[in-house]
Swiss-Prot record:
It holds the Pfam family HepT-like. This is Putative RNase TTE0752. The keyword Phosphoprotein applies. InterPro entries: HepT-like (IPR008201), HepT-like_sf (IPR037038), HepT_RNase_toxin (IPR051813). GO terms for molecular function: nucleotide binding; RNA nuclease activity. Its EC number is 3.1.-.-. Keywords: Hydrolase, Nuclease, Nucleotide-binding, Phosphoprotein, Toxin-antitoxin system. It comes from Caldanaerobacter subterraneus subsp. tengcongensis (strain DSM 15242 / JCM 11007 / NBRC 100824 / MB4). A motif (RX(4)HXY motif) lies at residues 74-81.
Length: 112
């Protein structure tokens, strides 16, 4: 079975990046900056890909984390790139990523 720790660490790194980079900017600033929009989308893709690599048993053990939804967002970003809704990206980063960061930190502490 694959060890989940490296994938969790990737998720945590991307969450930390997103949380730090979103500070002090508005949605309007975000959508006007192609480097930032690409970076944020890429971070969400990495999070989703890392989730997909977590063993099923592990995801089931930690079922409070919305693994399926995270992986689904990754699929949508990868396969429908030209239809990306930046408002959804923005809201996800503001509302969901801090909670995911917290959950992953807790899991990493428990799984030492």
């Amino acid at each position: 079975m694959k060890t989940p720790r490296p994938y969790l660490e990737h998720i945590l790194q991307e969450c930390e990046f997103l949380i730090e980079r979103v500070k002090g900017i508005s949605f309007e600033d975000f959508v006007k900056d192609p480097v930032l929009t690409r970076a944020f989308v890429r971070s969400l893709e990495i999070i989703g890909e890392a989730v997909k690599n977590l063993p099923k048993e592990f995801r089931e053990k930690h079922s409070k984390v919305p693994w399926k939804e995270i992986a689904g967002m990754r699929d949508k970003l990868i396969h429908e790139y030209f239809g990306v809704n930046y408002r959804i990206i923005w809201e996800t980063i503001l509302k969901e990523i801090p909670e995911l960061e917290k959950q992953v930190k807790e899991i990493l502490q428990k799984e030492k």
